[in-house]
Amino acid sequence: MITVVKRNGRIEPLDITKIQKYTKDATDNLEGVSQSELEVDARLQFRDKITTEEIQQTLIKTAVDKIDIDTPNWSFVASRLFLYDLYHKVSGFTGYRHLKEYFENAEEKGRILKGFKEKFDLEFLNSQIKPERDFQFNYLGIKTLYDRYLLKDANNNPIELPQHMFMSIAMFLAQNEQEPNKIALEFYEVLSKFEAMCATPTLANARTTKHQLSSCYIGSTPDNIEGIFDSYKEMALLSKYGGGIGWDFSLVRSIGSYIDGHKNASAGTIPFLKIANDVAIAVDQLGTRKGAIAVYLEIWHIDVMEFIDLRKNSGDERRRAHDLFPALWVCDLFLKRVLEDAMWTLFDPYECKDLTELYGQDFEKRYLEYEKDPKIIKEYINAKDLWKKILMNYFEAGLPFLAFKDNANRCNPNAHAGIIRSSNLCTEIFQNTAPNHYYMQIEYTDGTIEFFEEKELVTTDSNITKCANKLTSTDILKGKPIYIATKVAKDGQTAVCNLASINLSKINTEEDIKRVVPIMVRLLDNVIDLNFYPNRKVKATNLQNRAIGLGVMGEAQMLAEHQIAWGSKEHLEKIDALMEQISYHAIDTSANLAKEKGVYKDFENSEWSKGIFPIDKANNEALKLTEKGLFNHACDWQGLREKVKANGMRNGYLMAIAPTSSISILVGTTQTIEPIYKKKWFEENLSGLIPVVVPNLNVETWNFYTSAYDIDAKDLIKAAAVRQKWIDQGQSLNVFLRIENASGKTLHDIYTLAWKLGLKSTYYLRSESPSIDEKSVLDRSVECFNCQ
């Protein structure tokens, strides 16, 4: 006889009827699974004095091991079994306690922020919770939710169930609304039905005492020691609270540059990048993983060759930074020179820093002037040779990322208020940034203070004229001896990404888009006001432009379920129509919110204020990819232009397509805008390898689920170009290539096509060998946790 050790330590005979109740519920109404098969295979592993916990884990593992291409529903069996166990751990029974009890318990344990639940009718909201929606999770989805998002106590025991999580997030984000119960319910409905999902930081931290809700930050380093080290401090603080970072180093003077009038005194950007690398390692993200920092450099910078080699395993280790993610800020002129097989001139930004402030024709004019200037430092390289080096590194290591400076800035709705200097870690965010500005603070012996620009000429009482940054305590100005001269900073701009994604596998009709997009735009706008900001500059920037990034996920599932082949004419037309609707309703909602809550501060003189939308600045070649003409749009764009001019816009930036790997796993759909990896693969988890089958795989969808490696990479680029027409920011776009199909010409054609079609960036180049192990494990180690 087999005996069982209960949770309370009591030993009693195994009661198979109790197990049968759970196995029956776990297999009910699921095709291709068998209650008896589950019980028989699990019982083979039972032993005397087995614990109830071990029985539960054995049942779950038995179901997980049965997940396969022809039996994908075992994933839902495993999920249900996991949920039954979770209910008992959290509630003490198979079900949900009252919402009020959940809040009181979580507050008592210090895991939920006190003070916002009082703004709501807890009886009403408790009555709206739908526990049955838990059964939407497949096994990997519920495991991901448990491991990354559900709240736990100090001993790592779960204290939260999925629907309570969704409701408390909804409440937190609706707390300042005029009708908080109504808006919270709208947020809950969309999130809990998996129609859309917030990015990882919002899901994990909304409702908690550490409500850092933003995914990524983008900043810029000035060319002085004070500014460089202030940047490290800022990166450290941002990383501490779990933010992914994109940082522009293009202003930092190159190797061989001048320092204090001495030529060849500068060691260039690389030593400073090594320190940034150490910041990423030292300031791990809440103790869970090392920081993630992408560093950007303009392609005309003299240090570009070393920058490309930043992560190489060979060479001088003092010039390597293996934990950074290098990205190149590529201008049109460089790629024109590549196509012309012409020479490319590299400059020192110390002598031509205005190039970082210019793009398009203004940049080209100034660049040509610098080329003709005999007085400044220059280096020359054949543009095609530099391009080959970039592409070779891209193929070998997937890096450096490529981002196209002119494409990004041409379509910047806030070009009147600054310039886009780089993207973020995942290359989908494009917003204005600016480095700190430094000036001289002169403190006199009488305690008074005066300020000067660094290079401002000042005449001392000794009749000596010098730059303000050369003043010392030996100088006297207007009869007042100087006590000390110090450099102080005026904050620049560090951009913020607040992200969420529409699930196209569920939301793909005009009616549903019209219903869901306004809810998610409002939710993201509320994130801005309720966010915890690591420093003042970040908050000021976010409140200045009120940037959000609404994206999409589940495109491959949506196409398969509509029996549309990837890269086909129908594919391009379908996503064109969907993205138009999403863009239209996102802009419309922001205009409505502007009337309700006020416009963003930089609205005046923006492209929005002139009625100029992303589609109005779309790339001409991209427009030719679908047959929709200029006057053949489904939406009333002219009416919306007039509305925006009258109302204003609540948000300076609206749309961006992020990677979504975690949240797409959570809701059981395909990742972001990408084709599938394989029909079946394995995800690595704390529990081991978990088999995963693409969603809703059946005879109707089988032929329409095509591996990314079996799709022409140019079709990925063309699909991205169609989406980009409607997006004011960018897309996190991976390119997939089989090794046997790779060549210099292939890579050249792919990435020049991306540039020509108006894309703003590409993310990783993922290559795969022709022989793939049957137990293919998807490598997510290189992915940004925060944009997921």
From Swiss-Prot:
GO cellular component: ribonucleoside-diphosphate reductase complex
Domain of life: Bacteria
Name of a matching Pfam family: Ribonuc_red_lgN
Cysteine disulfide links: 216-497
Keyword Transmembrane: no
Binding, GDP: 200, 424, 428, 661-663
Site (Interacts with thioredoxin/glutaredoxin): 784, 787
Annotated PROSITE patterns: ATP_CONE, RIBORED_LARGE
Catalytic residue positions: 424 (proton acceptor), 426 (cysteine radical intermediate), 428 (proton acceptor)
Regulation: Under complex allosteric control mediated by deoxynucleoside triphosphates and ATP binding to separate specificity and activation sites on the alpha subunit. The type of nucleotide bound at the specificity site determines substrate preference. It seems probable that ATP makes the enzyme reduce CDP and UDP, dGTP favors ADP reduction and dTTP favors GDP reduction. Stimulated by ATP and inhibited by dATP binding to the activity site.
Name the UniProt record assigns to this protein: Ribonucleoside-diphosphate reductase subunit alpha
Species whose genome carries this gene: Helicobacter pylori (strain ATCC 700392 / 26695) (Campylobacter pylori)
Biological classification of the source: Bacteria, Pseudomonadati, Campylobacterota, Epsilonproteobacteria, Campylobacterales
Gene label: nrdA
